[in-house]
Amino acid sequence: MAVANLTTEQAILSEVHKQNRNRRALRLWLGFVLLALFCLVLVGGATRLTNSGLSITEWKPIHGVIPPLSAAEWDEEFRLYQRIPEFQQLNSSMTVDEFKSIFWWEWAHRLIARGIGVIFALPLLYFWLTGRIEKRLRWPLVGILALGALQGFIGWWMVSSGLSVRTDVSQYRLATHLVMACLIFAGCMWIMRGLSPHSNDPAPARSSRGLAAAIAVFALFQIYLGALVAGLDAGFSYNTWPLMDGAVIPSDLLIQQPFWINAFENPKTVQFIHRIGAYTLFALVLINMVIALRTAPWTTHARRAVLLFALVTVQAAIGVATLLMQVPLHWGLLHQAGALVVFGFAVANWRGFYGEYPHETMIAERD
């Protein structure tokens, strides 16, 4: 009997070691995907801030990978751009060479997006066929792949909003596009964190997990508000801090009717709400840090709480600097990068309260 138990124990240990090797491979893969997604969001931000998003007026999922290669092809691409309101109303004096500078941002954004589809789908297929993906993770990963495909349609849906009447894309569709990118990012982060070893430190308080969830969700909401700010060019509405045009609450926040539409279409109101959201997020991470340091100092949870507070503080400082300098490109991109770092860490922090995925073994499955 003892020999049988020893054999069973050895078999389980062998399976666990094998799963640990597979998990390391999956973490490396998902980490690379996260890095690519981070770059994609930054290039997307640059595309928006340089007003390049409408430079490619057709959706060519396959042969759109190849850019114009001759003067005639550039002339044809430029001719298509000349048909839309953005050129006719804002850029009518633009030359082909000037057009190229905005074309390359949008082309790079689409190319990276296609590349991410490849570096996600092909390894997923390989890991699946070779049995390296645990059963519990198969369909969640397929779900992320499906969200990626949907994101491609959302991207074109966003671009199409600026091709007929508007001179820019809809801020609603822009926000949807960015939030979807963040959800895909969060899904990859959640699974990668679950595949990583966790400490055995107890949670600081009963409310810690709920507070971690609230911080992650609110960070995503702040990103949504930031997308509205970008879509409406609301960063140029008030370029003072901490007051807005000399007041704590400006007088022209509710000038549009019905009043609720101001929260989505009045640039000044949108910036005001984004500021309030930043203060709220700062308060949440401060409360989270104080609770962790008081109830569970020197634990992994406390260290994460301190780091999260530091990240939000730096991000707030970058936001203020970007505002005061009237949104220069590099600072705007730094602010967007900071938002994704804060959100990614908030998701990882939240996932940290659930522990590592239990190992799957044939013994456990039979039991």
From Swiss-Prot:
A biological-process GO annotation: heme A biosynthetic process
Topology within the bilayer: Multi-pass membrane protein
Domain of life: Bacteria
Annotated residues for binding of heme: 274, 335
Cofactor or coenzyme needed: heme b
Subunit structure: Interacts with CtaB.
TM segment ranges: 25-45, 111-131, 139-159, 174-194, 210-230, 272-292, 305-325, 327-347
InterPro entries assigned: COX15/CtaA_fam, HemeA_Synthase_type2
Catalytic reaction equation(s): Fe(II)-heme o + 2 A + H2O = Fe(II)-heme a + 2 AH2
Example of a GO cellular component annotation carried by this entry: plasma membrane
A single GO molecular function term of this UniProt record: oxidoreductase activity, acting on NAD(P)H, heme protein as acceptor
Top enzyme class: oxidoreductase
Pfam families found in the cross-reference section: COX15-CtaA
Compartment(s) of residence: Cell membrane
Family: Belongs to the COX15/CtaA family. Type 2 subfamily.
Keywords: Cell membrane, Heme biosynthesis, Iron, Membrane, Metal-binding, Oxidoreductase, Transmembrane, Transmembrane helix
Protein name: Heme A synthase
Pathway(s) annotated for this protein in UniProt: Porphyrin-containing compound metabolism; heme A biosynthesis; heme A from heme O: step 1/1
Record organism: Rhizobium etli (strain ATCC 51251 / DSM 11541 / JCM 21823 / NBRC 15573 / CFN 42)
Role description: Catalyzes the conversion of heme O to heme A by two successive hydroxylations of the methyl group at C8. The first hydroxylation forms heme I, the second hydroxylation results in an unstable dihydroxymethyl group, which spontaneously dehydrates, resulting in the formyl group of heme A.
E.C. no: 1.17.99.9
Principal location: membrane
